[in-house]
């Protein structure tokens, strides 16, 4: 209850300062209790986007700590997970949910496409780059840019940056060495997103 009261007070202060401000929370699990219109507006969409997309397209857990053959390419599991978790989001929360493929905590999506379980603490950084699948990355981008929500690109994903989970996922941006084909694909998909919305 204290947590809920804090967020109600927080929302009141924020909305008084700027009624248009968006209160977006990082949350794992069902956020429904905080999305009743008096606390958060939306969430970083792990459960209804990042995790199901990752399992479906790569079979990997988002930290690259586990590979699950039973979830790789399993359309029933993907659809069921998406439907189940999307139910906990009101329409306005769904359309503002932060749909990420990668972020500052998890392995890069492009690295997950190589289906290699590992972390940089016991594997070389080069292992995160070996055998990545750009076709799968493009499939993920297409889903990200056409799915309901706010597609959020973690810096470097558009340029082909790889990396296992934190801290390897925080590599520097490859200025002048970007993957031009991937960058071009991102631009095309962003244009489609802007034109038709999600």
Where are these regions (language model features)?
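Active-site-proximal helices and loops of the catalytic beta/alpha 8
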Residues: 1-97, 143, 160-192
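Conserved glycosyltransferase catalytic-site signature
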Residues: 4, 137-138
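Aromatic/acidic polysaccharide-binding cleft in carbohydrate-active enzymes
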Residues: 37-38, 99-125, 141-180
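A broad, low-specificity signal for short, low-complexity segments enriched in glycine/proline
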Residues: 56-63, 111-117, 133-136, 180-181
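Aromatic-anchored helix/helix-loop segment that forms the rim or "lid"
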Residues: 66-70, 76-79, 117-137
């Amino acid at each position: 209850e204290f947590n809920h009261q804090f967020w109600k007070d927080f929302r009141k202060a924020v909305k008084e300062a700027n009624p248009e401000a968006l209160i977006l929370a990082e949350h794992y699990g069902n956020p429904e209790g905080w999305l009743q219109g008096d606390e958060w507006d939306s969430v970083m969409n792990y459960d209804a986007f990042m995790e199901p997309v990752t399992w479906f397209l790569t079979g990997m857990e988002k930290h690259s700590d586990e590979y699950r053959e039973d979830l790789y390419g399993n359309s029933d599991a993907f659809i069921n997970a998406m439907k189940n978790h999307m139910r906990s989001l009101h329409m306005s929360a769904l359309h503002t949910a932060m749909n990420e493929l990668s972020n500052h905590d998890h392995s890069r999506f492009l690295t997950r496409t190589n289906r290699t379980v590992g972390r940089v603490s016991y594997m070389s950084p080069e292992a995160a780059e070996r055998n990545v699948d750009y076709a799968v990355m493009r499939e993920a981008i297409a889903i990200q840019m056409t799915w309901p929500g706010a597609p959020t690109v973690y810096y470097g994903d558009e340029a082909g940056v790889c990396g296992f989970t934190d801290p390897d996922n925080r590599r520097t941006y490859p200025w002048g060495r970007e993957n031009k084909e991937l960058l071009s694909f991102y631009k095309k998909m962003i244009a489609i997103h802007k034109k038709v919305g999600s």
